[in-house]
From Swiss-Prot:
GO biological process: apoptotic process; positive regulation of apoptotic process; positive regulation of transcription by RNA polymerase II
CC per GO annotation: nucleus
Main location: nucleus
Protein name per Swiss-Prot or TrEMBL: Cysteine/serine-rich nuclear protein 3
GO molecular function: DNA-binding transcription activator activity, RNA polymerase II-specific; DNA-binding transcription factor activity; sequence-specific DNA binding
Cellular compartments annotated: Nucleus
Native organism taxonomy: Eukaryota, Metazoa, Chordata, Craniata, Vertebrata
Function description: Binds to the consensus sequence 5'-AGAGTG-3' and has transcriptional activator activity. Plays a role in apoptosis.
Gene deletion effect: Mice display no obvious defects in development, hematopoiesis or T-cell function. Deletion of Axud1, Csnrp2 and Csnrp3 together causes partial neonatal lethality, suggesting that they have redundant functions.
Source organism per UniProt: Mus musculus
Family the entry assigns: Belongs to the AXUD1 family.
Length: 597
């Protein structure tokens, strides 16, 4: 090994001779010239006396097999030519045709070899296929002509019997409009055709015994099952003697035995059409379910995508102010009088103040000062859960009350048509101490919106037809028709005792709702009703915790219809003239807009 590496080194250094792949000895462990060069370099470094690289001349390290396989895998296979071997035909004795004998085969040795390029081979295959297709179309044309002459075999014709394939010309067949590659397939050849091909190939004598053997094989394939009738004797039953089970696909086929009379030791198989039909239906249903599941998966993904896309925009809408206007706002005291819904301000801390303002503005109607969404209050979780439950109950009750009120309203609409006015409070009379906490209330004006015009009615008719019952909800007085059943107001009566944080109760009935929100300390104080027969029974409303000033107290008292003076004279420096001036400033320049209901 060392001497061989030394010789190679000398040959490489001289430059006269260079080792090639063909020169490598078969007994050499090297498999290529590149590996030999690597061995030379390793031997050269060992001979130089390098102490770092020890000598590898005493043993050989073969190249990695994995690396060699990887190098072979990177190469792509390219065919440059096609080699075709031709064999002569011989009698085969290997196939079983559907009829006759004289099977086709080939000799054990090829008689010629021919090479084609890829293009030449493709053209040659197309030519051969076209020739075979031409012969096939000629035979079809010949058969159609014979059937036409003999009238589908009912009439004998000498002319039809004398016709051959050679009588059919290429003009009679449409070969140009037929795709050869798509139409081409192997066709079975009849017995005469096979005999002619064998004689053309040089077969002088055709073995006739093959014909009898093929007939026996075909009969054995056609004959299946035993010949037993009703009963099977294991000693005479062919199925039992062959060691196979008796098979019954239908009545007496292929085996004629019955289930009770079969004595085959191997057993018995009976075709069950119900089981096959059930299996078929289950398979079809399973495939349909899988197809529906695949069709529903993209749809659900699209729905989730829409929900996720609209999710951020839907978030603030849940806390924004909803402007829900009832169908008719009817006032029983004075038909043409306007109702002023006050936008009060709360003196609470943080987000709780904003949410309570949201609830008061929602109950009192649509206010132009509540155009931006408010953040939810940081109340206790228990209170929020109670609020959600009560909201669901209130929505159900409101729907029922709305349906009942519409039915009751149909009998009184023609008798008591009243005007309705929707007032928007601008907050011009808001106290100066609240400008910092609610700055967006300070730049609006009081607007009166005429909802609809009706024929005024007398207070006596109104009180008789629409006797109301007072309901206090979070310090707000709700006027609802008396015709409703008292069971629907159970939850409303209970709300005066429970503390809610900014619950929204949509107005589902057409009654006027006057909301007087109160603070936590004054949550039990009710508002004054709009009807004179109830003002004597209820105390006057004090707005100490909301208006935070004596001017607003006098103004609210004036709106209630009496000249009630505050119980604290020391805290009320304003005179009656100033109160009247403040009242006139709030209601001056009304803007009336008719909204169809």
């Amino acid at each position: 090994m060392r001497s061989q590496g030394t010789c190679d080194n000398a040959a490489a250094m001289s430059g006269i001779l260079k080792r090639k792949f063909e020169d490598v000895d078969a007994s050499s462990p090297c498999s290529s010239a590149r590996e030999s060069d690597d061995e030379v370099s390793s031997s050269e470094s060992a001979d130089s006396g390098d102490s770092v690289n020890p000598s590898t001349s005493n043993h050989f390290t073969p190249s990695s097999i994995l690396k060699r396989e990887k190098r072979l895998r990177t190469k792509n296979v390219h065919f440059s030519c096609v080699t075709v071997y031709y064999f002569t035909r011989r009698q085969g004795f290997t196939s079983v045709p559907s009829q006759g004998g004289s099977t086709l085969g080939m000799s054990s040795r090829h008689n010629s070899v021919r090479q084609y390029t890829l293009g030449e081979f493709a053209r040659e295959q197309e030519r051969l296929h076209r020739e075979m297709l031409r012969e096939h179309l000629r035979e079809e044309k010949l058969n159609s002509l014979k059937l036409k002459m003999t009238k589908n075999g009912t009439v004998e014709s000498e002319e039809a019997s004398t016709l051959t394939v050679d009588d059919i010309s290429d003009d009679d067949i449409d070969l140009d409009n037929t795709e050869v590659d798509e139409y081409f397939f192997l066709q079975p050849l009849p017995t005469k055709k096979r005999r002619a091909l064998l004689r053309a190939s040089g077969v002088k004598k055709i073995d006739v015994d093959e014909k009898h053997e093929l007939r026996a094989i075909r009969l054995s394939r056609e004959d299946c099952g035993c010949d037993c009738r009703v009963f099977c004797d294991p000693e005479t039953c062919t199925c039992s003697l062959a060691g196979i089970k008796c098979q019954v696909d239908r009545m007496s086929f292929p085996c004629g035995c019955t289930k009770e009379g079969c004595s085959n030791t191997a057993g018995r198989i009976e075709f069950n059409p119900i089981r096959v039909r059930t299996h078929f239906l289950h398979t079809i249903m399973k495939l349909e379910l899988e197809k529906n599941r695949e069709q529903q998966t993209p749809t659900l993904n699209g729905c989730h995508g829409e929900i996720s896309a609209h999710g951020p925009s839907m978030g603030p809408v849940a806390h924004s102010v909803e402007y829900s206007i009832a169908d008719n706002f009817e006032i029983e005291t004075e038909p043409q009088a306007a109702v002023l819904h006050l936008q009060e301000e709360l003196d609470c801390q943080g987000d709780e103040e904003e949410e309570e303002e949201d609830g008061s503005s929602f109950c009192s109607g649509a206010t132009d000062s509540s155009t931006q969404s408010l953040a939810p209050s940081e109340s206790d979780e228990e209170e929020e859960e109670e609020e959600e439950e009560e909201e669901e109950e209130e929505e159900d009750d409101d729907d029922d009350k709305g349906d009942g009120f519409v039915e009751g309203l149909g009998a009184h609409t023609e008798v008591v048509p009243l005007p309705s006015v929707l007032c928007y409070s601008d907050g011009t009379a808001v106290h100066e101490s609240h400008t910092k906490n609610a700055s967006f209330y300070a730049s609006s004006s009081t607007l009166y919106y005429q909802i609809d015009s009706h024929i005024p009615g007398t207070p006596s008719q109104l009180s008789d037809n629409y006797s109301e019952r007072d309901t206090v909800k979070n310090g707000a007085l709700s006027l609802v028709p008396y015709a409703m059943t008292p069971e629907r107001f159970v939850d409303y009566a209970r709300q005066a005792e429970e503390a809610y944080g900014a619950s929204h109760y949509p107005a589902a009935n057409p009654s006027v709702i006057v909301c007087c929100p109160t603070s936590e300390n004054d949550s039990g104080v009710p508002c004054n009703p709009l009807y004179p027969e109830h003002r004597s029974n209820l105390p006057q409303v004090e707005f100490h915790s909301y208006l935070k000033g004596p001017a607003q107290e006098g103004f609210v008292s004036t709106l209630n219809g009496d000249s009630h003076i505050s119980e604290h004279p020391a805290e009320n420096p304003l005179s009656l003239a100033e109160k009247s001036r403040l009242h006139e400033e709030c209601i001056q320049s009304p803007v009336v807009e008719t909204v169809p209901v």
